[in-house]
């Protein structure tokens, strides 16, 4: 087998081994990206964002969005907002 053919064969087989070892890519979830983008635009950023990411200085409210800091309950590990009226 000539050198060029051998090289092409190796280049064809190599990516298949890499894909099998890594596995398929995770499914893309557009809803999570939209929520994350909305939170970056509207939610109040402070030094430790993990518990306060749902709290905002503005009176915003929503399921996975954020709500005003006055009504945001951050007593547990995750902040919760009251239901929208």
UniProtKB/Swiss-Prot annotation:
Q: Which residues form the propeptide?
A: 22-40
Which region is the signal sequence? 1-21
Localization: Secreted
Q: What keywords is this UniProt entry annotated with?
A: Disulfide bond, Neurotoxin, Secreted, Signal, Toxin
Describe PTMs of this protein.
Contains 5 disulfide bonds.
Coarsely, its chief localization is: secreted
An example Gene Ontology CC term for this record = extracellular region
**One MF term in the entry's GO annotations:** toxin activity
- Asked whether the UniProt record includes Signal among its keywords, one would answer yes
The organs and tissues expressing this protein are described as: Expressed by the venom duct.
Task: Tell me its family.
Answer: Belongs to the conotoxin D superfamily.
- Tell me, what does this protein do in biology? Probable neurotoxin.
What is recorded about the protein's domains?
The cysteine framework is XXVIII (C-C-C-CC-C-C-C-C-C).
Q: Name the chain's protein.
A: Conotoxin Lt28.2
């Amino acid at each position: 087998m000539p050198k060029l053919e051998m090289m092409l064969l190796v280049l064809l087989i190599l990516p298949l081994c890499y894909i099998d070892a890594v596995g398929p890519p995770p499914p893309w979830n557009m809803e999570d990206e939209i929520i994350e983008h909305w939170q970056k635009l509207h939610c109040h950023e402070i030094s430790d964002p993990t518990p306060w990411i749902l709290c905002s200085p503005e009176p915003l409210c929503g399921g996975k969005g954020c709500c005003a800091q006055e009504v945001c309950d951050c007593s547990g590990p995750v902040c919760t907002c009251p239901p929208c009226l």
